[in-house]
C-alpha cells in the first residue's frame, strides 16, 4: 500500500539525467507527478549542502585528501532536520528514493515527500508514546517504510534498532531485553508477526507492536490505517545532543550472544566520505547498494552518505537474490552507481553480459570481504569499470577505501580514510613495517573520530576488550605495501597456523578463484596431529563442472594452487558443496564451516 498522498497509476518516469525509464505495469508515482527538474538546478544546492559539514569538498589526490579533509560538526546535529528537511526546503521536487519490487511496482519519493511522510510517521509514533531515548526495533526488510521510520525516529530523538526478518522468537527476546526495546515496527509477513508476537510475554520493556501490513493480527497497531488521522507534526524543543545514542546494531562474533554497537547522532556525518567520495556520488546519481536494512551496510549504502550527496537511493525489494534480477534492474532503471559484496560480483561474472545493457553504470564499489583479483579482472573485462574496494565494520564507517583519485590495485582495500588514524600493529602493540602482517587498529588518543561507535551498549567489559590503551582493535589482519595500500588477510580467528606458517584464507581463495571450475570457495583450518592445522577448501563448482567433482578435480585444484601461490598454502582437503554458508549481507561464514568440521571430528 502506498503512503497517503501517493496514488497508484501508470505514467512516464524519468531518471535524474532526464532519461525516460522503461514503462512498468502498475508503476506507482506521486499523484502530483514530481518529475525531476534539470540536474543543474541542484548543483549549487549540492555544493552548499556538503560545504555545511566539510571545509573542503573536492579532492584531487591522496595527499590532498589526507591533509584537507576536515569536518564541521554542528551542535545538536540531527540528520533528519539538518539534511533531509534542508533538502526538502531547497530542492523539494528532487527525487530522493525510488522503490521497486519483483513485480515491477514502483514508488517514487521526492525530498518533499520524505519530509511530509516522515513528519507524519513521527507524529504517529509520538501518539504511540515513543519519544526521545526510547528504543524501537525495525524489522522492515526493504520496504520503503524503513526509510520513513528511520527519519521519523531521528526527528523524535529515539533510538532505532534495525533487525533482520529472519530472527526467531529467542533472538527477538534477547534483543528486546538487552536493549530495552519499547516498540517493534515490522512487516506483515506471517513468520515475522508470529515471532514478534511470541516475544512479547518474555519482554518486559516491550509495550507497542506495529504492523505495516498487509496482515495486522490482534495486538498490533495498523500503521496505514492509523497514521492518516494523526495531528500535524510539531518539532520537539531539544531533540538530541550529539553524544546521545541514535542507532543500535546487533553484531555477531565468533562466540557468545551478539553485541550491541551503539552509534551517536554524529554517526551520519562519518558517512560523508562513504557516499560522496568512496561511492563518488553526485546529484545526478542513482545508487543501488545490495544490502538488507537489518544490517549496518544499509546505513553505509542506502541512507546517510547517499542523501548527503543528493543522490537517488534505489531500493529493490526482492524475495530471492539472483544476479540476473539485479542486472535487469540496473538496465531497466539506468542505475549509475552500484555497491555490493564480492559474492554478488562473483555471481554476476558468470552471467552472459551480452544479454544486458549496463551502459548507465559509471561507478562500482565493493566491501564486506576481500575481493578476489580474478573477479575484478573479469568484471572489468565485461564492463570496463574498475571495482573500488573499501573496508569497515558495523562499529565504523568506511575506514579504508579506494577513492576516485586512486588507481585501484585488485584485491587491495585501498588506503586509510583520513578521518581515522589507522595503523597496523603486532601482538605487542608495536607498529608493523611495510609488508608485515598485523592487526588493523584505530588510534583514539586524540579523541573518538566521527563514525566510530561509542562502545558496546550496556557492556563495558566487551568494549574494553577491543578498545583500550588508546587503540580500537578491529580484529582484522592485513598488510601494507610500499605504496601505502592495505591488503586484507582475514579475521584474527581465520588465520591458519600450519607447520609454523601463518596462512591467510584470502590468498588461497584468490588462487583457487583463478581456476575456471570455481565459482566460490572458503578456506578454513582443520586440526592435524602433525602440522597443527591443515588448509581445507570448501568449493562451489560452476554448473559445467559439477559432474566432474571427484579425486581428479581435487588433484587438479591442488596443483593449481601450488602453481598460483607458495606451495605450502595448498589445500590438503577439498570438499565440494552446492553453496557456502553466508550472512544475509553476503559474508562467508567460515566459523560455521569450522564448527561443522569440528562436529564431524567429534
Q: Which role does the model predict for each range below?
A:
Residues 32, 40-49, 151, 155-225, ...:
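Structural core segment of the AMP-binding/adenylate-forming
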Residues 92-95, 210-221, 228-250, 257, ...:
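Conserved pre-ATP/AMP-binding loop-to-beta segment of ANL
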Residues 93, 97-151, 168-173, 225, ...:
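Conserved AMP-binding/adenylate-forming core of the ANL superfamily
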Residues 107-112, 246-270:
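Conserved AMP-binding A3 loop
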Residues 167, 173-175, 184-189, 338, ...:
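AMP-binding/adenylate-forming catalytic core of the ANL superfamily
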Residues 212, 563-587:
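AMP-binding/adenylate-forming catalytic domain of the ANL superfamily
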Residues 224-225, 308, 335-340, 349-409, ...:
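Gly/Ser/Thr-rich phosphate-binding loop
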Residues 269-286, 293-336, 351:
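Conserved AMP-binding/adenylation subdomain of ANL enzymes
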Amino acid at each position: 500500500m502506498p503512503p497517503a498522498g501517493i496514488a497508484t497509476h501508470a505514467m512516464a518516469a524519468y531518471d535524474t539525467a532526464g532519461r525516460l525509464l522503461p514503462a512498468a505495469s502498475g508503476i506507482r508515482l506521486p499523484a502530483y507527478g514530481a518529475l525531476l527538474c534539470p540536474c543543474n538546478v541542484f548543483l549549487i544546492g549540492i555544493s552548499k549542502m556538503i560545504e555545511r559539514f566539510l571545509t573542503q569538498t573536492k579532492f584531487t589526490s591522496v595527499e590532498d585528501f589526507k591533509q584537507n579533509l576536515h569536518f564541521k560538526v554542528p551542535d545538536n546535529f540531527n540528520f533528519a532536520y539538518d539534511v533531509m528537511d534542508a533538502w526538502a526546503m531547497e530542492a523539494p521536487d528532487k527525487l530522493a528514493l525510488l522503490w521497486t519490487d519483483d513485480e515491477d511496482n514502483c514508488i517514487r519519493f521526492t525530498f518533499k515527500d520524505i519530509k511530509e511522510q516522515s513528519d507524519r510517521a513521527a507524529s504517529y509514533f509520538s501518539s504511540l508514546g515513543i519519544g526521545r531515548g526510547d528504543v524501537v526495533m525495525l524489522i522492515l526488510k526493504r520496504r520503503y517504510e524503513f526509510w520513513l521510520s528511520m527519519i521519523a525516529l531521528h526527528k523524535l530523538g529515539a533510538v532505532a534498532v534495525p533487525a533482520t526478518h529472519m530472527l526467531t522468537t529467542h533472538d527477538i527476546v534477547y534483543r528486546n531485553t538487552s536493549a530495552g526495546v519499547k516498540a517493534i515496527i515490522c512487516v506483515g509477513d506471517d513468520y515475522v508477526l508470529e515471532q514478534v508476537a511470541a516475544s512479547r510475554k518474555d519482554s518486559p520493556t516491550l509495550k507497542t507492536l506495529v504492523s505495516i501490513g498487509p496482515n495486522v493480527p490482534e495486538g498490533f497497531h495498523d500503521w496505514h490505517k492509523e497514521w492518516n488521522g494523526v495531528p500535524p507534526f510539531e518539532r520537539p524543543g531539544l531533540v538530541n545532543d550529539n553524544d546521545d545514542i541514535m542507532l543500535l546494531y546487533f553484531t555477531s562474533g565468533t562466540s557468545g550472544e551478539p553485541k550491541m554497537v551503539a552509534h551517536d547522532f554524529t554517526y551520519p556525518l562519518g558517512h560523508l566520505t562513504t557516499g560522496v567520495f568512496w561511492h563518488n556520488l553526485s546529484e545526478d546519481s542513482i545508487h543501488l547498494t545490495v544490502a538488507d536494512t537489518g544490517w549496518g551496510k544499509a546505513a553505509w549504502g542506502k541512507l546517510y552518505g547517499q542523501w548527503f550527496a543528493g543522490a537517488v537511493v534505489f531500493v529493490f525489494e526482492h524475495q530471492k537474490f539472483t544476479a540476473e534480477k539485479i542486472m535487469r534492474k540496473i538496465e531497466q532503471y539506468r542505475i549509475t552507481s552500484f555497491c555490493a559484496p564480492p559474492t554478488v560480483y562473483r555471481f554476476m561474472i558468470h552471467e552472459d553480459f551480452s544479454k544486458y545493457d549496463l551502459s548507465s553504470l559509471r561507478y562500482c564499489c565493493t566491501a564486506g570481504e576481500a575481493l578476489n583479483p580474478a573477479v575484478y579482472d573479469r568484471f572489468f573485462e565485461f564492463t570496463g569499470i574498475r571495482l573500488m574496494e573499501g573496508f569497515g565494520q558495523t562499529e565504523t564507517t568506511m575506514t579504508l577505501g579506494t577513492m576516485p583519485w586512486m588507481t585501484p590495485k585488485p584485491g587491495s582495500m585501498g588506503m586509510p580514510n583520513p578521518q581515522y588514524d589507522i595503523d597496523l600493529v603486532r601482538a605487542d602493540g608495536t607498529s608493523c613495517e611495510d609488508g608485515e602482517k598485523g592487526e588493523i587498529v584505530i588510534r583514539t588518543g586524540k579523541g573518538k573520530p566521527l563514525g566510530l561507535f561509542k562502545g558496546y551498549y550496556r557492556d563495558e567489559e566487551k568494549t574494553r576488550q577491543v578498545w583500550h590503551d588508546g587503540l580500537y582493535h578491529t580484529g582484522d589482519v592485513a598488510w601494507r605495501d610500499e605504496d601505502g595500500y592495505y591488503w586484507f588477510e582475514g579475521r584474527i580467528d581465520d588465520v591458519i597456523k600450519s607447520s609454523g606458517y601463518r596462512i591467510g584464507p584470502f590468498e588461497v581463495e584468490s588462487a583457487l578463484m583463478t581456476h575456471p571450475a570455481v565459482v566460490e570457495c572458503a578456506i578454513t583450518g582443520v586440526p592435524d596431529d602433525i602440522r597443527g592445522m591443515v588448509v581445507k577448501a570448501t568449493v562451489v563448482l560452476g554448473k559445467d563442472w559439477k559432474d566432474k567433482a571427484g579425486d581428479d578435480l581435487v588433484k587438479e585444484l591442488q596443483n593449481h594452487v601450488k602453481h598460483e601461490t607458495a606451495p605450502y598454502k595448498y589445500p590438503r582437503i577439498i570438499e565440494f558443496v552446492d553453496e557456502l554458508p553466508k550472512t544475509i549481507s553476503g559474508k562467508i561464514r567460515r566459523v560455521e564451516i569450522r564448527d561443522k568440521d569440528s562436529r564431524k571430528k567429534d
